[in-house]
Each structure stands twice: as structure tokens, then as C-alpha cells.
Amino acid sequence: MKLYAPWQRAFEKIATPFEQFLHAQTTTGLMLMLMTVVALLLANSPLSDEYLHIFHTNIDIFVGNYGFSKSIHHWINDGLMAIFFFIIGLEIKRNILVGELSNIKVAMLPILAAIGGMALPALIYYAINYGDIGEAGWGIPMATDIAFAISALVLLGRRVSASLVTFLVALAIVDDLGAVVVIALFYTQEINMLPLLFAFISFLVLVSFNRFGIHAILPYFVVGFIMWLFMLESGIHATVAGVIAAMAIPSRPKYTPMDFTKSVKSRLDEYDNYPIEDNYMLHEQQKAILQNVKDKIDAISSPSARLEHSLHLPVSLVVIPLFALANAGVSINFSSAYDTLLQPISLGVMAGLVFGKVFGIAGISYLAIKLGIAKLPEGSTMSQVFGVAFLGGIGFTMSIFIAELAFAGNSELVFQAKIGILAASLFAGIFGFIWLRFIAKSAN
């Protein structure tokens, strides 16, 4: 094919949704790591006061007498993180419908492993903090940071099988679902029924849009935003609105594949009937045909697929890095760091994320495989599953998020939890990587 500009080359890669998902999570993991380092440096530098002051600065949004007055820190955690939870909701829905969780036989192992990896860490933390002020933080070590965990696994390249990566992704998705349920049920303030009722009505409107075949994204955005506002006033954490809204987004395309192929082929045949000009300029009618084909390409992709694809980049490059910058910065007094790590909250978090995750995930997996309930991921060994269980101990994003909810208003307890999260996540990530890189043997 002759190109108008021969020195310009276009390279196109058609990636599967799963490959796109892995790439997005790897990008998120790298950005998360970078901004965590920046936050820690700022919090332990002469600029620490300015750093803290920025995120505690209030931003007021009022329309008449109605509005909100929250700090930048709260706008990030309650507002921007709702977009992150919306992405989680879309990923959960896709995985249940057509992804790693759509086949119950394949999904059984990661589902059981995730349950073990949530229950045992919570029990270990609760046992250490039973009857103490930190008891409410039992949900902190339940979470796995999917971005960090997948980034570590992707760095191992061909040393791990694709099915092992799929196992970790499915496990983390179930883990995220569990974390959302825990946040909604157990980390909720006093519930205000009227705003909650309006939020429910907003959700019903979103469902009706889906049922009536509305595929335009704008109506879902407007009503979803209204639902988030009501959820913010209801007492249930506003980020839950993101997950609920995702469930109402249509997952079916406007056209069937057969109708799409027939329609596009007809339009392209019409396009070819026009003569090619010497200067390669298109006729106006050709431009209209191409626009029509573009519209049909958009229509063959479901709204949920389009949103997941378009939001991954801003979430990876803006939302998650801002969350890390606002929440990961803890001022560490190295002379008392050891004492902090020995506090029940820090100990509970570390024991939960390291020992709880490892024995919860690997232990349940081993039992399920031995009992014939589930099968080992193809091309993998139990030793590799043990390494993946260590990576499951990287709690970070969701763990910090739950810590902020569990100990809201008590900065000292939040600090202890964050120290435990940072220490456990660092240890779990490094040890899991070393185990999979140098110790675990692959099936091949």
C-alpha cells in the first residue's frame, strides 16, 4: 500500500481486553510506586508542613444553600476514588460475564483462595487487637493491591505461566469485591435514610436506562453523579456508588456482530466506489461514510467496555497517584519506628498481610486441589501458588483506604496502620518476587 507520507509508519497492536487490563495495572503499579516514594520524601523533608497543609485545605462547593465543604484529602478519597471503584465495578462485572470468573470450574480456585486470603488476615488482626482501641481495623489486612501484585508478576516475564497471572487477577478481583462489601456493611457512619432512598431511586433510573437500551454514556454519567451526591449524604461511603453504578452500565453492544459486519461491509463497498484522487483527498461523501463506520465501531463495543477502556488511563495516571500522594506520606521517626511496629495495630496489619494472606491463599488452594474441588492453574506448581500468595500480601491502596475509614479522626491510629501496611507490603512484594524468581520451579 502506498502511503501519502512514506517516512511515517503507523504501528497498531490489537490487544485482548485481558492484555489491556494487565498493561493498565502495570502502569498503575509503577505510578503508585513513584508517588508513594514522593509522598514519603515530602512527609520526611523540611516541606512536610506545607505538604500536609495542602491536602488539609478546604474546598467549598455550594449551589445556593446546598453544598459541601471538604478538604482536598477528602475530595480525593470520597470523590476521585469513586471513579477508581467504578473501574473496579466494571472489571468485576466483565470478569463474571465473560472473563476469568465466568467459568465456575476455572473460577473455583481463585474464589476459594480469595475467601481464605480475606478471612484469615481479618481473624489474625482481630485476635491481636481484640478488646483494644484498634479492634475496628480488622478489615485493613483483607485487601490485595492488584496493581502492585500484577506489576511484580509481570516483571517475572515467562518464568510464570499465563494461567498463573490469570489466577492472581481473578483472586484480586474477588478480593476487591469482598473489600467493597466490607466497606459498605461495616465501615458506614450513621445512615440517613432519605438520601439513601434517593440514591436507590437514582440506581433504579440507571437500571431503567439499561433495560430500555440506552447506550449513550452521558445519561449514565449524569444520574450516576447524582447518585454519588446522595450516597455522600447517606452515611454509606460515597465510593460504593461507583461500584453500584458500574453494575447498571450495559454490557451488550448495540449491534450483533453479524449485523455490524454486514453494515460496515456495505458502507466500505460504497466507499470503494469513489475514484481515488491524485492528492489522496477524500470526497465529502467518503468522509461521511467513514464517520458512519466509526459510529458503528463505537456501537459494536458495549458502553461498559468503552468506559473501562477510556477510564483506565486517567485512573492510572491521575486518580491512583493522587491517592498515594495524599495518603501514603507518613512522617517516620526512625528512633521510634521499632516501637511503632510493635504496636498492636501495626502488628495486626503486618501479621495479617504476611502470614494471613500466605496461609489463607496457599492453604485453601492446597486443600481445594487435594479435595478435587479445584484444579491447579495450567503450567503452574503449588510452589508458584505459594509465591503468588505472598504477592497477595501487598495490601497498599485498599488497605490504606480502609484504615482511613476504620480510624477516621484518629491520626495516630491511622499512622500505626499505615506503617504496618508499608512494612508488610514491602516485605510481601520483595519476598514474593524473590520466591517466584529464584526458588519456585515452574511446571515447564
From Swiss-Prot:
Keywords: Antiport, Cell inner membrane, Cell membrane, Ion transport, Membrane, Sodium, Sodium transport, Transmembrane, Transmembrane helix, Transport. One of its GO terms (molecular function) is sodium:proton antiporter activity. It catalyses: Na(+)(in) + 2 H(+)(out) = Na(+)(out) + 2 H(+)(in). It comes from the Bacteria. One of its GO terms (biological process) is regulation of pH. It is found in: Cell inner membrane. InterPro entries: Na/H_antiporter_dom_sf (IPR023171), NhaA (IPR004670). Its main location: membrane. Pfam families: Na_H_antiport_1 (PF06965). It is a multi-pass membrane protein. The chain crosses the membrane at residues 27-47, 72-92, 108-128, 136-156, 167-187, 190-210, 212-232, 312-332, 349-369, 385-405, 419-439. One of its GO terms (cellular component) is plasma membrane. NCBIfam families: NhaA. Na(+)/H(+) antiporter that extrudes sodium in exchange for external protons. Belongs to the NhaA Na(+)/H(+) (TC 2.A.33) antiporter family. This is Na(+)/H(+) antiporter NhaA.
